[in-house]
Design a protein with these regions (language model features):
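N-terminal signal peptide c-region/cleavage motif recognized by signal peptidases
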Residues: 14-18
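Sec-dependent N-terminal signal peptides
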Residues: 4-13
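Extracytoplasmic metal-acquisition and chelation regions
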Residues: 19-169
Length: 169
């Protein structure tokens, strides 16, 4: 019996547990895409639901705590989350997911923006100076973002790079 127990312990110690890559998705469409590309290699937390307006989210303590644990922050960008994302990033204290770092990913950076206004001021109402941030409504954009996201997942989790690239195909 003791021999079997020792063999069991040896097997456990020889196979280190793999921790999933924590992904913080600002909107459900990006959470779904990250889950599709990452499978069981990612743990996705989605900050909003399809019933919420992503323009008007509050950086609640629960969101900040989830962002604090993330290796990748995945948002639309193009000012869609401008009302709450800067506060969330600052309060999270997570250097990995700050703008300019590999853990910060804005989907809008990988597509051609439409409806960019010639001039933007408050007299025109809620105008996005970077263009229409609702990029997920065009399926061609999803493919462009998926390609870039698979590369970013591979960069952040090099041990599973082939897995992410295969799922992107």
């Amino acid at each position: 019996m003791q021999k079997y127990f020792l063999v069991f312990l040896a097997l456990l110690s020889g196979a280190p547990a793999h921790a999933a890559l924590n992904v913080f998705a600002c909107e459900p469409e990006w959470g779904a895409l990250a889950q599709e590309l990452g499978g069981d290699q990612v743990a996705v937390y989605t900050a909003t639901t399809a019933l919420q307006d992503p323009h008007h989210i509050q950086a609640r303590p629960s969101l900040i705590a989830s962002a604090r644990k993330a290796a990748l922050l995945l948002c639309t960008g193009a000012e869609l989350e401008a009302g709450w994302l800067p506060v969330l990033l600052r309060q999270s204290g997570n250097a990995q997911i700050q703008p300019g770092r590999p853990g910060y990913f804005e989907a809008a950076a990988y597509v051609q923006m439409l409806e960019i206004p010639a001039r933007a001021d408050r007299a025109q109402g809620d105008v996005h100076a970077s263009g229409n941030p609702h990029i997920q409504t065009d399926p061609r954009n999803i493919l462009l973002v998926a390609n870039a996201l698979a590369q970013r997942l591979a960069q952040l989790d090099a041990a599973n790079a082939a897995f992410y690239q295969a799922r992107q195909q």
